[in-house]
Regions:
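N-terminal leader/linker segments that precede catalytic domains of diphosphate-processing enzymes
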Residues: 1-53, 59-114, 130-131, 150-152, ...
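Short, Lys/Arg-rich amphipathic segments at extreme N-termini
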Residues: 6-12, 157-160, 172
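Short hydrophobic segments within beta-strands
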Residues: 42, 157-159, 196
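Compositionally biased accessory segments in Actinobacterial proteins
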Residues: 88-92, 153-155, 189-195
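NUDIX/MutT-family hydrolases
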Residues: 116-150
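Conserved beta-strand scaffold positions in the cores of enzyme catalytic domains, especially
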Residues: 125-127, 155, 181-182, 204
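Metal-dependent nucleic-acid phosphoesterase active-site entry motif
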Residues: 154-166
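Nuclease catalytic cores that cleave nucleic-acid phosphodiester bonds
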Residues: 163-212
Length: 212
């Protein structure tokens, strides 16, 4: 039922977390002109829990919702982002409380920094360059998770591969290596990676990783 997840989940010792069935948030990336990426962040309204901090659009999951459904819905409600304007890439469990309560971050990409419409839960919304996110006063939970959510930029050599060019830029998650922001700007940030090349000290990527 819509809205049945709103409320505090009370764990042992009276510790509370918002969302009776857990919570989810959307980490939405978009390309910047120089090849880097920006992340959509919400400056939380002063009256809200941890008001004045920066975090992801997100909130309580309803009983019938998947984490993806909840995160995308919350982004539309809190930031005016339509589901058709993003592509989900991955999910990451970013918090588990002793009570069993969980927070899941859904990672997605947009083709460009989209216009936003703030609701009453936001003091403002902003597309923040990825390398500047950690400089903001972040919500404690998001600050702890950002270390594993941040994407490292990599430059992909296209070699006239049009299918590959159409797939970039984008976020990719590699097992045991984390997230990477792939782009094709020769003068953009990050090291160059050769797809399907010989193993190096850096991340090993295949063409299939990019066009998946």
């Amino acid at each position: 039922m819509r809205g049945d997840g709103d409320g505090w989940y009370k764990g042992p010792g009276g510790v509370k977390h918002w969302g009776k069935f857990g919570a989810a948030g959307l980490l939405l990336r978009a390309p910047l002109p120089g090849g880097g990426s920006a992340v959509l962040l919400q400056h939380r309204a002063p009256w809200s829990h941890q008001g004045g901090t920066w975090a992801l659009p997100g909130g309580a999951r309803d009983s019938h919702e998947s984490p993806e459904h909840a995160a995308v819905r919350e982004a539309e409600e809190e930031a005016g982002i339509a589901a058709d304007d993003l592509r989900v890439r991955a999910e990451r469990l970013t918090m588990t409380a002793p009570s069993g309560w969980t927070y899941i971050t859904v990672i997605a990409d947009a083709d460009k920094p989209l216009p936003t419409v703030a609701n009453r839960e936001s003091a403002e919304l902003a597309w923040v360059p990825e390398d500047e996110v950690a400089d903001l006063p972040l919500h404690p939970g998001f600050a702890a998770a950002w270390i594993e959510l941040r994407a490292v930029p990599l430059r992909v050599r296209l070699d006239a591969d049009t299918e590959l060019a159409d797939a970039l830029p984008r976020t990719v998650e590699l097992p045991d290596q984390g997230f990477f922001w792939l782009h094709a700007r020769d003068d953009g940030p990050g090291a160059e990676v050769v797809l399907d090349g010989e193993p190096t000290e850096g991340p090993v990527l295949t063409r299939a990783d990019v066009i998946a």
